[in-house]
């Protein structure tokens, strides 16, 4: 089983607690609003696989390294991670067509800074908003 450390909205804020929380993880996923590429560098220093997307506050240093949307598969689970995705019945209009055409099993998105986990019955996918890790 792959263990995932999930965070978002660090806004350039580093907390050593990230390393404690993620020490037993196999991968670390950052769902955008990283703020500074130094956050990624510190996460990468753990030697764990890093997956990320850029958010609306991220500059070119982050946007040059990570996509707006990241679709991938982990242990046969299809994942779509993006920063501004919306919520069940209120998805971002920019992604709704693709989301309904080819929904992932797991949809990770943020922007509200409030951690939530919901199951979208209509698309049969788990929706996770990790909330804000920064200040």
What feature does the model see in each segment?
Residues 6-8, 27-33, 51-56, 81-83, ...:
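Active-site neighborhood of phospho(di)ester-bond hydrolases with catalytic His/Asp-centered motifs
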Residues 1-50, 58-69, 76:
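N-terminal active-site segment of His-dependent metallophosphoesterases
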Residues 21-24, 73, 100-102, 122:
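Flexible, charged surface loops at secondary-structure boundaries
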Residues 13-14, 41, 60, 81, ...:
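A broad, structure-centric signal for solvent-exposed, well-ordered loop/edge residues
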Residues 12, 36, 86, 114, ...:
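Short active-site segment of divalent metal-dependent hydrolases/proteases
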Residues 1-5, 71-80, 120-127:
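Beta-strand-turn-beta hairpins that frame and shape the catalytic cleft
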Residues 51, 89-135:
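Conserved beta-sheet core of the metallophosphoesterase superfamily
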């Amino acid at each position: 089983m792959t263990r995932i450390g999930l965070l978002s909205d660090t806004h350039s804020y580093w907390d050593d607690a990230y390393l404690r929380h993620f020490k037993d993880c196999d991968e670390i996923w950052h769902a955008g609003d990283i703020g500074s590429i130094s956050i990624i560098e510190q996460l990468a220093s753990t030697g764990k696989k890093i997956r990320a997307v850029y958010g609306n506050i991220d500059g070119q240093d982050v946007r040059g390294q990570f996509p707006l949307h990241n679709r991938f598969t982990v242990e046969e689970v299809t994942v779509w991670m993006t920063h501004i995705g919306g919520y069940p019945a209120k998805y971002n209009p920019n992604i709704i067509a693709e989301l309904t055409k080819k929904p992932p099993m797991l949809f990770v998105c943020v922007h509200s800074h409030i951690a939530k986990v919901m199951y979208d019955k209509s698309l049969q996918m788990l929706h996770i908003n990790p909330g804000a890790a920064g200040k």
